[in-house]
Amino acid sequence: MKAPGLPADQQFFADLFSGLVLNPQLLGRVWFASQPASLPVGSLCIDFPRLDIVLRGEYGNLLEAKQQRLVEGEMLFIPARAANLPVNNKPVMLLSLVFAPTWLGLSFYDSRTTSLLHPARQIQLPSLQRGEGEAMLTALTHLSRSPLEQNIIQPLVLSLLHLCRSVVNMPPGNSQPRGDFLYHSICNWVQDNYAQPLTRESVAQFFNITPNHLSKLFAQHGTMRFIEYVRWVRMAKARMILQKYHLSIHEVAQRCGFPDSDYFCRVFRRQFGLTPGEYSARFQG
């Protein structure tokens, strides 16, 4: 039964979730991505848990030998700050979920019409990952250390899909005010795409608003201007990379959205009082 009054994209995902939860026998093994010592070029790594579900065809994770051929019904759970490198040369329909603290991100990929870099459909819905949802995600993250416990893992993922279905079936009028949700959506999107060449104009265009509207959102709902927020996110990512990974300063700058490593070093030193090299030395010792 279709939920009443849902926008077209939201109804599309509502139908997808209905097909999944009403046919659990079609769901297969749940695989788990891990956190690599270094991040290969092209790999995906964000601060939120993710779940990729193969709806049709073949998918895979090139970072794990046993995960390079995932077939219809199989799933890949990527804990927060874990990474995957998608196989993108096979015919596939894929549903990808992102579990952020205040929103649920849904993307549908169809290799017949788009690549795995560009979703055919994509929405973000307000959803506080607290209580039941947070407990499920925490449990799955812990179970990633015991991936063979499929008799526990699969029912847990099915319960998570039921919860997602309830979020997707919620009419937009029952959600938080649009301005607040849009502001948090932009902030979270920047956290996922900080390595890209972001400008006020390009981000505003992506969210189908004017640059002035974007600036107004940050003035009303945030504590810093948009460009300052982008710089803050990039600096936070740079600190994390410098603490955990043995990369050149040029590589760190590139991964954090700074094509000019000299400018990256100046910004980093101005913000933290140390050069990136000095900061890294404190942790890499």
Swiss-Prot record:
PANTHER family (alphabetical): ARAC-FAMILY TRANSCRIPTIONAL REGULATOR, REGULATORY PROTEIN POCR
Disulfide bonds: none
SUPFAM superfamilies: Homeodomain-like
MF annotations from Gene Ontology: DNA-binding transcription factor activity; sequence-specific DNA binding
Annotated protein name in UniProt: Uncharacterized HTH-type transcriptional regulator YpdC
Alphabetized InterPro entries for the sequence: Homeodomain-like_sf (IPR009057), HTH_AraC (IPR018060), HTH_AraC-typ_CS (IPR018062), Tscrpt_reg_AraC-type_HTH (IPR020449)
Keywords: DNA-binding, Transcription, Transcription regulation
Known DNA-binding region: 201-222, 249-272
All copies of domain HTH araC/xylS-type, residue ranges: 184-282
Annotated source species: Escherichia coli (strain K12)
Coiled coil ranges: none
